[in-house]
């Protein structure tokens, strides 16, 4: 799977994660199957935001509602691993929704993943 994303958007997400490098940042990804068009930061409402993330339910429900009304297509989520790599954790896999992209930021890089047959597979992120 190949997915295009603007270099400026990748830089913005890396910068966002660097603002508070001890906590996981998270948000929503919008676009289509071949391109991430936009990302929206959402509050991390997890009980332990230093180790995990939970997208604010109201923000997620609003994104789904807007998509159903003809708004931007919600294609996935992003989050950071403050003390780890940009690879999915077992916790990520347990929460993963098939058909959605997972952009993970860690170790100064961003990598893109999707679930297939119960496992994460890395997507080729084409930065342009």
Model regions and ranges:
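Conserved beta-strand-loop surface patch within small alpha/beta domains used
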Residues: 1-74, 82-128
């Amino acid at each position: 799977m190949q997915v295009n994303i603007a270099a400026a958007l990748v830089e913005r997400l890396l910068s966002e994660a660097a603002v508070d490098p001890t906590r996981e940042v998270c948000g929503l990804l919008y676009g289509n199957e071949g391109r991430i068009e936009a990302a929206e930061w959402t509050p991390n409402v997890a009980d332990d935001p230093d180790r995990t993330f939970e997208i604010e339910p109201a923000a997620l429900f609003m994104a789904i509602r807007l998509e159903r009304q003809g708004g931007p297509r919600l294609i996935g989520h992003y989050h950071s691993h403050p003390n780890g790599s940009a690879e999915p954790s077992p916790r990520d896999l347990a929460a993963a929704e098939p058909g959605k992209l997972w952009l993970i930021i860690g170790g100064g890089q961003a990598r893109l993943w999707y679930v297939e047959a119960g496992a994460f597979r890395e997507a080729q992120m084409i930065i342009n």
